[in-house]
């Protein structure tokens, strides 16, 4: 709750700037904390008070759920865009008539997908114009103040980040392929290839760069990019496949250019009858082109088996006829080529003497080295996180084995220790619940304890009649306890340190009444039962002694047991805070469900019955 004094300090402090603006209600003032304030609004506000400020224009909290969800959606859109853009390199296709054509159907499909992806970049710019930012001068302490003034947000964004987002959002391929290139002179195929080579790559770089700050924002908000380790490993593998996808597309386009370069070399030899425009499929039916093609030896000279021209690393594309194949066939072949050479660091590439080809091979080797190292490192980190607790348990088990060997424990004790460790691992999977709960706020810790323990505590008939506050106090102090088969929870005559509420498993409870000759009483207890009730009797004593009571029974687990334990100090605290535990009705209920009181009652009934029998015999 924001107090009037806080509002006064907030309006008068140096950290607050005021700007004149009409209220959302249309009058000359705004309501803040149920008070009518002057017609000025906050331009900066603490993050905790952000939701209390109502504005006419929607300003998003950079730490809020809306921005967090949008960042995830935009990250997916960016990855789709990075996948779609290299597909434009597959538009040129080599025809049997020794010419290059453009796949119209693929072109239309890619432009539609690219246009949809561009919409997300435009929305991202809109979101950036309406997202508050933390004032740099307020980062000294706490989470800082949010600047919510629209003009300041716009000014900051225009000077920082807008140009990059604007370049990434431009629909350059659509405009150039559909509008600019058809109106240019010269070969349409040559112009299209130049656009694909330069414009796509130039715009691809800022789009690729946007991935890194976007991932950083998601990590700052949640600590991770993905929620699970397997999703994180798949995310890094997908980035590696994306690099293979880009390299394969570049290799395909360069293969077509190398094949066209071979044709042009032959054309120079046949200069009298050949023109470079002949390699555009729009010129296939031209009479000069037809006569040249009939007499030309271009098909034989530019064959992969010919020694006329060195295709270098692009020889596979010509030999396998990738450049003339259908879209999906050439795409998957190029993807495999990129993945294979990226993983092998380009060791299988046999280059020619062309400088551009050698530089491309160097890029493949360098990029493969960096990306492969990052992939292995990130994959190892993500996958190890799924087995880190298992590895910790193995290390701890090794330490335990070494300690038992050093202390020369007998085999039966060693087996008991191993059995307990294994059962504890199966039950908890290495998670220390108490340690996790201690790091949470008190209110949240109480709610979790209530969720985990309330129904289990209510199974105990003794606690069924208690009110909610008393049950919450008990649940808050319950601690999980595990016992393996043949474990003695308590022995007759030993001090009772804790009261146990059985959740799962069965136990034997028996007594000899202090070792009295011929006396033996036993019973079976299971889920919903409890033991150690002597401790509750001690805690309910108005003047309890410092000496913890001794157990009147021996309790032994006959199967694996899960229980909640309430230690003596906690039980004493609950009994002192809630006087209802001292009620006569609750005491009677305790005695009714207590095995100790049942045994005493049975003994008294037996004594009374024997006395009655003896009196009857004496009277006869």
Curated annotation (Swiss-Prot):
Does the record bear Nuclease in its keywords? no
Tissue distribution: Expressed in roots, stems, leaves, flowers and pods.
Where a nucleoside 3',5'-cyclic phosphate binds, per the record, is at 462-559
What membrane topology does the annotation report for this chain? Answer: Multi-pass membrane protein
Looking at the UniProt record for this protein, which Gene Ontology cellular component terms does it annotate, in alphabetical order? Answer: nuclear membrane
Please name the SMART domains in this protein's record: cNMP
Q: A single GO BP annotation from the record? A: arbuscular mycorrhizal association
Q: Which key words are in the record?
A: Ion channel, Ion transport, Ligand-gated ion channel, Membrane, Nucleus, Transmembrane, Transmembrane helix, Transport
Pfam family of the protein (one): Ion_trans
| Localisation per UniProt entry | Nucleus membrane
The UniProt function text for this chain reads:
Cyclic nucleotide-gated channel involved in the establishment of both rhizobial and mycorrhizal associations. Required for full activation of nuclear-localized Ca(2+) oscillations by Nod and Myc factors. Simultaneous activation of the K(+)-permeable channel DMI1 and the Ca(2+) channel CNGC15 can give rise to sustained Ca(2+) oscillations. May function during fertilization in both female and male gametophytic Ca(2+) signaling.
Protein's UniProt name: Protein CNGC15b
């Amino acid at each position: 709750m924001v107090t009037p004094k806080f509002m006064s300090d907030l309006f008068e402090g140096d950290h607050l700037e005021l700007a004149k603006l009409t209220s959302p209600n249309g009058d000359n003032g705004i309501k803040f904390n149920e008070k009518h304030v002057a017609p000025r609004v906050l331009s900066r506000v603490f993050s905790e008070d952000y939701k209390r400020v109502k504005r006419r224009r929607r300003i998003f909290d950079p730490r809020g759920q809306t921005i967090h969800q949008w960042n995830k959606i935009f990250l997916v859109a960016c990855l789709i865009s990075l996948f779609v853009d290299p597909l434009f390199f597959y538009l040129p296709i080599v025809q049997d008539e020794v010419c290059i054509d453009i796949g119209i159907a693929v072109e239309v499909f890619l432009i539609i997908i690219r246009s949809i992806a561009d919409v997300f970049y435009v929305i991202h710019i809109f979101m950036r114009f309406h997202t508050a930012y933390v004032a740099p001068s307020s980062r000294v302490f706490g989470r800082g103040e949010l600047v919510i003034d629209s003009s300041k947000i716009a000014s900051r964004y225009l000077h920082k980040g807008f140009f990059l987002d604007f370049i990434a959002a431009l629909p350059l391929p659509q405009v150039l392929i559909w509008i600019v290139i058809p109106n240019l002179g010269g070969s349409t195929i040559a112009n299209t290839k130049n656009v694909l080579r330069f414009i796509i790559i130039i715009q691809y770089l800022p789009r690729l760069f946007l991935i890194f700050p976007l991932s950083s924002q998601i990590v700052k908000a949640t600590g991770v990019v993905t929620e699970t380790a397997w999703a994180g490993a798949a995310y890094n593998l997908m980035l590696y496949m994306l690099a293979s996808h880009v390299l394969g597309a570049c290799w395909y386009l360069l293969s077509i250019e190398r094949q066209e370069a071979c044709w042009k070399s032959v054309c120079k030899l046949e200069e009298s009858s050949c023109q470079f425009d002949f390699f555009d499929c729009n010129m296939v039916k031209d009479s000069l082109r037809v006569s040249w093609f009939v007499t030309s030896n271009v098909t034989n000279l530019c064959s992969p088996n010919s020694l006329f021209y060195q295709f270098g690393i692009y020889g596979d594309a010509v030999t396998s006829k990738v450049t003339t194949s259908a879209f999906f066939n050439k795409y998957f072949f190029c993807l495999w080529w990129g993945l294979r050479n990226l993983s092998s660091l380009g060791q299988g590439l046999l280059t020619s003497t062309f400088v551009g080809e050698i530089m491309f091979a160097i890029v493949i080797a360098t990029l493969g080295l960096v990306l492969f190292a990052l992939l292995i490192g990130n994959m190892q980190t993500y996958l190890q996180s799924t087995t880190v607790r298992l590895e910790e348990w193995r290390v701890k088990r090794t330490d335990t084995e070494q300690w038992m060997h050093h202390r020369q424990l007998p085999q039966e004790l060693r087996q008991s220790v191993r059995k307990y460790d294994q059962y504890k691992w199966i039950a908890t999977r290495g998670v220390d619940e108490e340690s996790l709960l201690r790091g949470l706020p008190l209110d949240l810790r109480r709610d979790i304890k209530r969720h985990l323990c309330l129904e289990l505590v209510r199974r105990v008939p003794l606690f069924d009649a208690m009110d909610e506050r008393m049950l919450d106090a008990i649940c808050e102090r319950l601690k999980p306890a595990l016992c393996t088969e043949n474990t003695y929870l308590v022995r007759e005559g030993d001090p009772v340190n804790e009261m146990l509420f059985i959740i799962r498993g069965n136990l034997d409870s028996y007594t000899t009444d202090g070792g009295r000759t011929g006396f033996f009483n036993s019973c079976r207890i299971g889920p919903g039962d409890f033991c150690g009730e002597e401790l509750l009797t001690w805690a309910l004593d108005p003047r309890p002694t410092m000496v913890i009571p001794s157990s009147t029974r021996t309790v032994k687990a006959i199967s694996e047991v899960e229980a909640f334990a309430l230690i003596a100090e906690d039980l004493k605290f609950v009994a002192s805070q809630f006087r209802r535990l001292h009620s006569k009705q609750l005491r009677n209920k305790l005695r009714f469900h207590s095995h100790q009181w049942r045994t005493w009652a049975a003994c008294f009934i037996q004594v009374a019955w024997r006395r009655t029998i003896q009196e009857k015999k004496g009277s006869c």
